[in-house]
Amino acid sequence: MSDLTSTILFEHPLNEKMRTWLRMEFLLQQLESHRSLDNIANALTFFRSASDLIDVLERGEVRTDLLKELERQQQKLQQWADIPGVDVSLVDSLRNQLKSRAAVLMSAPRIGQSLKEDRLISVVRQRLSIPGGCCSFDLPTLHVWLHQPSEQRDQHINKLLASLAPLHQSLTIILDLIRQSCPLRSQISLNGFFQDNAGGADLLRLRLPLDPQLYPQISGHKTRYAIRFLALDSENGTVPARLSFELACC
């Protein structure tokens, strides 16, 4: 069941804070994956992700929420340190990393401001909502920019991504600790349905076998959740009466 080549992992947030964090993580990964802007396709993916990230960052107190979570994780680790047999050096190392991330995040300029003030991103953002609105005749500035020497383009992009490093580093360690807080455990759904108590968790992680081709429809919040398994082929696919899968409530 744990064979990664024959299974697929799904994650589902159980609160709005986690929903925002997962979206930010996805967008930051997109920016990193398409940082080599050597063609229009990579460039548009990069700038669309940058535009989406600006929108996400403007919707809430991202810095405040992350700082609170960094502190919460430090407190949890302190409790672990008092348990006999725990690797105290590892716990101390993680706590120091959390403190370091918090200090950097606290002193960083307004998160996302560099993206928002970037002229090229601003110009491209105005055209993203228009179907086909990023043609060279619509965006001659982008067309010229893409024909600049790669060193010049890279310097521009590296500066933008460096401004996001405090956010990226804090988010990464937080999500890593949350994901590692609970192991995947074997479960069985009956007639395509499973439900349980969430116990104040932030995140559901679910690993399914690739065959049969199913996907989970998840609803829930911090106290309770329900999962319904549906066939990818809604007309001809079937859902087993008993389905084995793995689940973690983090």
UniProtKB/Swiss-Prot annotation:
It is found in: Cytoplasm. One of its GO terms (cellular component) is cell division site. The keyword Cytoplasm applies. SUPFAM superfamilies: YacF-like. Keywords: Cell cycle, Cell division, Cytoplasm, Septation. One of its GO terms (biological process) is FtsZ-dependent cytokinesis. It holds the Pfam family ZapD. The keyword Transcription regulation does not apply. Disulfide bonds: none annotated. Interacts with FtsZ. Cell division factor that enhances FtsZ-ring assembly. Directly interacts with FtsZ and promotes bundling of FtsZ protofilaments, with a reduction in FtsZ GTPase activity. Belongs to the ZapD family. This is Cell division protein ZapD.
